[in-house]
């Protein structure tokens, strides 16, 4: 089985925090205090009582993270930084779990995206009734078809995972951190990796591809995926690429809304996409279908 680096992207949200400069008033107060310490205090002149000194200003809260980090509201302590070799297994686990979640979505919810498959299944149920004249047997046909969809979705997606885990995800540092134009980032919370994303350059058209975005299911809804996506956009801008592209077979609407919120435009979809690891057997064609969506964010015109 030939396994090329796959293009499926995992879905799921934080805004990149920026370091705050020190308040200029603080420096001024420090200079005044130093000057006052050089001279002895003068005796108080007679007159009305002086007003009590103003209370010191409250300390300014500093954002979490730092250079390369992110700490928005709802994502306390989360930082986005480059991948380290010791985090290989944690990154692979998050990627694996995120892809395995696709199985029921592809088998059941994804059926709504394929009217031809729906029509075929309806014809099979009608044929069963015409042959058997059994209403009970006919009612079992949809359940059997959905069971077959789940079986083949699991089979194909697991084969896809095997390809991915033995290609780019087998050695993240070698595949993403060493080649120019590529990088891999992790989202870290309390010392634990909770999200991943990768970028890979295509020099022929001066674009960067967003890949492997996934967030641990226990930490979703905190803006981590959006922060990871923005890190890829920042990488593309810094390295002077003209656009960022991505492809996804995600079924959930939330994933597509995330890409649009980052500024991506939907460029089209294909119903005949072949995942790495597929055998293209007749059974797979009948019971496994995915729609591949293409997105693009233009950063500058060539």
From Swiss-Prot:
UniProt key word Protease: no
EC assignment: 2.3.1.17
Region annotation Disordered: where it falls in the sequence: 46-72
Keywords: Acyltransferase, Cytoplasm, Endoplasmic reticulum, Membrane, Microsome, Mitochondrion, Transferase, Transmembrane, Transmembrane helix
Induction profile: By methamphetamine in brain, via dopamine receptor activation (at protein level).
Expression sites (tissue/organ): Expressed in brain.
InterPro entries per the UniProt record, alphabetical: Acyl_CoA_acyltransferase (IPR016181), GNAT_dom (IPR000182), NAT_camello-type (IPR050769)
Biased composition regions of type Pro residues, renumbered to the chain: 46-60
Activity regulation summary: Aminooxyacetic acid (AOAA) blocks its activity in both cytoplasm and mitochondria.
Annotated GO MF terms: L-aspartate N-acetyltransferase activity
Subcellular location: Cytoplasm; Microsome membrane; Mitochondrion membrane; Endoplasmic reticulum membrane
Transmembrane helix found in the keyword field: yes
Bilayer topology: Single-pass membrane protein
Membrane-spanning ranges: 121-141
Domain N-acetyltransferase: 143-283
GO CC annotation terms, alphabetical: cytoplasm; endoplasmic reticulum membrane; mitochondrial matrix; mitochondrial membrane; mitochondrion
PANTHER family per record: GNAT FAMILY N-ACETYLTRANSFERASE (PTHR13947), N-ACETYLASPARTATE SYNTHETASE (PTHR13947:SF11)
Function: Catalyzes the synthesis of N-acetylaspartate acid (NAA) from L-aspartate and acetyl-CoA. Promotes dopamine uptake by regulating TNF-alpha expression. Attenuates methamphetamine-induced inhibition of dopamine uptake.
UniProt disease annotation: N-acetylaspartate deficiency: A metabolic disorder resulting in truncal ataxia, marked developmental delay, seizures, and secondary microcephaly.
Protein name: N-acetylaspartate synthetase
Originating organism: Homo sapiens
Record gene name: NAT8L
């Amino acid at each position: 089985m030939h396994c090329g680096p796959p293009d499926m992207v995992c879905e799921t949200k934080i805004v990149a925090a920026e370091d705050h400069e020190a308040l200029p008033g603080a420096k001024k107060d420090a200079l005044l205090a130093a000057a006052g310490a050089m001279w002895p205090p003068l005796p108080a002149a007679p007159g009305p009582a002086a007003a009590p000194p103003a209370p010191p200003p409250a300390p300014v809260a500093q954002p979490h993270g730092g250079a390369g980090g992110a700490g928005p509201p709802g994502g306390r302590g989360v930082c986005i930084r480059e991948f380290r070799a010791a985090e290989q297994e944690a990154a692979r686990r998050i990627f694996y779990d995120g892809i395995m979640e696709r199985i029921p979505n592809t088998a059941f919810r994804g059926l709504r995206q394929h009217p031809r498959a729906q029509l075929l299944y309806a014809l099979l149920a009608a044929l069963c009734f015409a042959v058997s004249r059994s209403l009970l047997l006919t009612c079992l046909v949809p359940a059997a078809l959905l069971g077959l969809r789940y079986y083949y979705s699991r089979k194909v997606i697991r084969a896809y995972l095997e390809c991915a885990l033995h290609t780019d995800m087998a050695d993240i540092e070698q595949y993403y951190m060493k080649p120019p134009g590529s990088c891999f980032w992790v989202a870290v919370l309390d010392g634990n990796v909770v999200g991943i994303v990768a970028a890979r350059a295509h020099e022929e058209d001066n674009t960067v591809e967003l890949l492997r975005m996934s967030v641990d299911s226990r930490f979703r809804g905190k803006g981590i995926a959006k922060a990871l996506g923005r890190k890829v956009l920042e990488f593309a801008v810094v390295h002077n690429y003209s656009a960022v592209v991505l492809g996804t077979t995600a079924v959930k609407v939330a994933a597509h809304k995330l890409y649009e919120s980052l500024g991506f435009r939907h460029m089209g979809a294909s119903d005949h996409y072949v995942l790495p690891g597929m055998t293209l057997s007749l059974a797979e064609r009948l019971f496994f279908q995915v729609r591949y969506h293409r997105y693009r964010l233009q950063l500058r015109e060539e």
